[in-house]
Design a protein with these regions (language model features):
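Glycine/tyrosine- and acidic-biased, solvent-exposed loop/turn segments at the edges of beta-strands
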Residues: 1-96
Length: 96
């Protein structure tokens, strides 16, 4: 697979900068959502997949594993009030 570096604006207004495969985010990149949230990490077929960090526009931060755009696997959520939740995330929620 030959990826190229590029910058694209998605249909929802989000802006992606990084590796592209056939015009789709694939590899390492940065996705800035229209609300100001920012994901930096791995992409497969246009979705966050692998390891990455999402900083929400309101300040909470999730860092860990992703599967098909959802927090799945080992991760850590740090909330703006300083509370930290670490464990195994399943479909976006900390299971243990």
């Amino acid at each position: 697979m030959n990826t190229i570096k590029g910058k694209i604006t998605l249909e929802d207004g989000a802006v992606y900068e990084g590796d592209l495969l056939n015009g789709i985010p694939y590899g390492k990149g940065k996705l800035t959502y229209s609300d100001g949230s920012v994901y930096v990490g791995d992409f497969v077929n246009g979705k966050s997949h692998g390891k990455g960090k999402l900083t929400y526009y309101f300040g909470d931060v999730y860092e860990g594993e992703w599967t098909n755009g959802v927090q799945n696997g080992v991760g850590k959520m740090t909330y703006t009030d300083g509370t930290v939740t670490e464990g195994i995330f399943v479909n976006g929620l900390c299971a243990k």
